Amino acid sequence: MDRIRLGILQVNHDKSETIGDHFPDDAHRFRDLFDALEQRFAYRVYMTIGDELPGSLDEQDAFLITGSPLSVLDEHSFLPPLYDFIRACDSARKPLIGTCFGHQAIAVALGGRVERAAAGWNVGIEATHFIENTSFMTDAQRDLGFYVFHEDHVSALPPQARLIGRGDFCPTAAFAVGNHIMTTQAHPEFTDRFMRAVLDDCVGLLGQDGHAEATASLDRGRNDGPLFSRWITRFILNHF
């Protein structure tokens, strides 16, 4: 059997000396995550932040939209075409995964709402409680810890979506549409080393207290990103 083709729509390009020069970019972090589980997709990266999108849904078997420090609440030239692409995936029931920014973009494209969280930044490790038992969630574990870094959140689901996971800070932590779209507000592709570097780089944004609180959550929390990546793999494989 040929490898399943996974198109990764990258909506971030970190060129900073502190982070971008020392860590793989978003698409490569996902590749590393999947490859570590010996699920080697045939990857194609689309630099959507540079207005690149697939020319056809048939170019790939499934798609994944990455996270980004950008906000769907702002005006970006790539957003309207990305929303059209998301709606096309939904209409064709094409397997689509969204993480962080991708989670929010899918919500907006399909008629949901994203707002700035009144409580401010949610940073560190947060547990998502999955409230739905589906075929791709074959592990008994239902409370998964994830790295998170966001200020915006999905405040209203699209009409056709259903909530599948919630967190203490983020009530809409994960949702699904049919059996072809699945999203998470979290970053399953982050590693502990990467997250700590990002936190250290964002002391000015978070403040000393915010940085200390987020760092403490890493020390006491658990990262279940690899487990969730197995769920993503099963979610995609269910279509083939």
Placement of each model-derived feature along the sequence:
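Short, glycine/charged-enriched secondary-structure capping and boundary segments
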Residues: 21-24, 58-60, 77-80, 111-114, ...
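Conserved beta-strand termini and adjacent loop/short-helix elements that scaffold enzyme active sites
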Residues: 46-48, 117, 149, 166
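Amide-donor transfer/coupling interface in amidating biosynthetic enzymes
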Residues: 2-11, 29, 91, 130-240
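Cysteine-nucleophile active-site neighborhood
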Residues: 66-132
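N-terminal beta1-alpha1 cap of cysteine-dependent amidohydrolase-like domains
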Residues: 1-77, 81-84, 90-92, 212-240
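A short acidic, often aromatic-flanked loop/helix-cap motif at beta-alpha or helix-coil junctions
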Residues: 50-54, 122-123, 154-155, 171-172
